[in-house]
C-alpha cells in the first residue's frame, strides 16, 4: 500500500533534480579578480558608451583598472537629461528624479509614474503601488505545478489499482 506513494516521490523527485542541477548562483566570493565573468552591462558594446534603451542612462564600458573587491560598480557614472521622452514607456528612476530635481523651474515634465493620487474629501492620499505581479505569477505557477502533480498522481494511482484488479468503479 505504501509503495505507490514512495514510487511517486522517487520518480517526481528525480524529475525535479535535473532542472535544479543546472541552476547555479554566483556569490561575490566566487569571482576571481582579473578573470572575466559572465556579467553583462546592458547598453555597452565593445567598451563604447551608448545610451540605455530602457532607462535613457549612459552606461560606461568596462574599465581596465580593477577595484578593491574585484567587482565593477553597478552604479552609472554619467546621466543625460532626456529631451525626447516617450510617454508610452514605463517609469524610470532617472525620469522621476529628474522631475523632482527640477521642480523649482517653471517647466515640469509630465511623467508616467506608479504613484497614484486620490482625493478623498479635502485630504490628498498618495499610494505607492509595488510590483505585485511577480508575486502573483510565482504563486500561480507553484499552485499550478502542485495541482498538475496531484492530477498525474491520481491518474497513476487509478491505473495501478486497475492493473492490480482492486479497482471497482
Swiss-Prot record:
Q: Which family does it belong to?
A: Belongs to the podoplanin family.
Q: What is the annotated signal peptide range for this record?
A: 1-22
User: Could you give the domain comment from the record?
Assistant: The cytoplasmic domain controls FRC elongation but is dispensable for contraction. The cytoplasmic domain is essential for recruitment to invadopodia and ECM degradation.
Q: How is it modified after translation?
A: Extensively O-glycosylated. Contains sialic acid residues. O-glycosylation is necessary for platelet aggregation activity. Disialylated at Thr-59; sialic acid is critical for platelet-aggregating activity and for CLEC1B interaction.
State the membrane topology.
Answer: Single-pass type I membrane protein
Protein name from the UniProt record: Podoplanin
Which species expresses this protein natively? Canis lupus familiaris (Dog)
An example Gene Ontology biological process: lymphangiogenesis
InterPro entries in the cross-refs: Podoplanin_domain (IPR052684)
Question: Which proteins does it associate with, and in what oligomeric form?
Answer: Homodimer. Interacts with CLEC1B; the interaction is independent of CLEC1B glycosylation and activates CLEC1B; the interaction is dependent of sialic acid on O-glycans. Interacts with CD9; this interaction is homophilic and attenuates platelet aggregation and pulmonary metastasis induced by PDPN. Interacts with LGALS8; the interaction is glycosylation-dependent; may participate in connection of the lymphatic endothelium to the surrounding extracellular matrix. Interacts with HSPA9.
Q: Where is this region: Requires for interaction with MSN and EZR?
A: 161-162
Enumerate the glycosylated residues. Answer: 25, 38, 41, 44, 47, 50, 59, 63, 72, 76, 79, 83, 92, 96, 106-108, 113, 126-127
Amino acid at each position: 500500500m505504501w509503495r505507490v506513494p514512495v514510487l511517486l516521490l522517487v520518480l517526481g523527485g528525480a524529475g525535479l533534480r535535473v532542472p535544479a542541477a543546472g541552476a547555479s548562483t554566483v556569490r561575490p566570493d566566487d569571482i576571481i579578480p582579473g578573470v572575466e565573468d559572465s556579467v553583462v552591462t546592458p547598453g555597452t558594446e565593445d567598451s563604447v558608451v551608448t545610451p540605455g534603451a530602457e532607462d535613457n542612462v549612459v552606461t560606461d564600458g568596462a574599465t581596465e583598472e580593477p577595484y578593491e573587491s574585484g567587482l565593477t560598480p553597478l552604479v552609472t557614472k554619467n546621466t543625460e537629461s532626456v529631451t525626447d521622452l516617450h510617454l508610452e514607456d514605463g517609469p524610470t528612476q532617472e525620469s522621476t528624479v529628474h522631475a523632482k530635481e527640477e521642480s523649482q523651474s517653471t517647466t515640469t515634465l509630465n511623467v508616467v509614474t506608479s504613484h497614484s493620487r486620490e482625493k478623498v474629501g479635502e485630504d490628498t492620499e498618495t499610494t505607492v503601488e509595488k510590483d505585485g505581479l511577480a508575486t502573483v505569477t510565482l504563486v500561480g505557477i507553484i499552485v499550478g505545478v502542485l495541482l498538475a502533480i496531484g492530477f498525474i498522481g491520481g491518474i497513476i494511482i487509478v491505473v495501478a489499482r486497475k492493473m492490480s484488479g482492486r479497482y471497482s468503479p
